[in-house]
Curated annotation (Swiss-Prot):
The record marks D36, Y37, D71, S72 as: Cleavage. GO terms for cellular component: cytosol; extracellular region; extracellular space. It comes from Canis lupus familiaris (Dog). GO terms for molecular function: cytokine activity; interleukin-18 receptor binding. Its main location: cytoplasm. Belongs to the IL-1 family. It is found in: Cytoplasm, Cytosol; Secreted. Gene3D superfamilies: 2.80.10.50. Pro-inflammatory cytokine primarily involved in epithelial barrier repair, polarized T-helper 1 (Th1) cell and natural killer (NK) cell immune responses. Upon binding to IL18R1 and IL18RAP, forms a signaling ternary complex which activates NF-kappa-B, triggering synthesis of inflammatory mediators. Synergizes with IL12/interleukin-12 to induce IFNG synthesis from T-helper 1 (Th1) cells and natural killer (NK) cells. GO terms for biological process: cellular response to lipopolysaccharide; cytokine-mediated signaling pathway; defense response to Gram-positive bacterium; establishment of skin barrier; extrinsic apoptotic signaling pathway via death domain receptors; immune response; inflammatory response; interleukin-18-mediated signaling pathway. Transmembrane segments: none annotated. Pfam families: IL1 (PF00340). Signal peptide: none annotated. This is Interleukin-18.
Amino acid sequence: MAANLIEDNCINLVKMKFVNNTLYFKAESDEGLESDYFGKLEPKLSIIRNLNDQVLFVNEGNQPVFEDMPDSDCTDNAPHTIFIIYMYKDSLTRGLAVTISVKYKTMSTLSCKNKTISFQKMSPPDSINDEGNDIIFFQRSVPGHDDKIQFESSLYKGHFLACKKENDLFKLILKDKDENGDKSIMFTVQNKS
């Protein structure tokens, strides 16, 4: 039994050129080519916890910290604990592209600009025409852990959202993944209906 050929999904190249140690190709036709971009899809309302079961909470200073909190307190503090995770269609296949926002008085979106984690007063845009952006993270399952998630920065490859204890606070930070099984970069995401 012969396999059926799938629709021709190839690009015919007609020219190659080296410029500053980068090889460029010229396609016979631009038809069907897309630019790299992220396009916003439907959001999910979620509670994010670290592996110590502490809840991600946006404090009055608009800073993301983890706190011990029973489920009833999560409901009572919903504007600070319920995150709006917008999923984005990604023109490349690198994981589920997401933004993480919270709406308390105004909409704020998580940013890792200059490798510093903060909430910026902004709504996530409908589309982002970049390959990497400070507000886009790739949400991925953790191999060997069915219910664990990690968030990799699209702007800083190999850098992940993580929980770190500083003084008496557990803060959300961006860190370079330094070892296999690093539990500080693992989270559980509980979607609300």
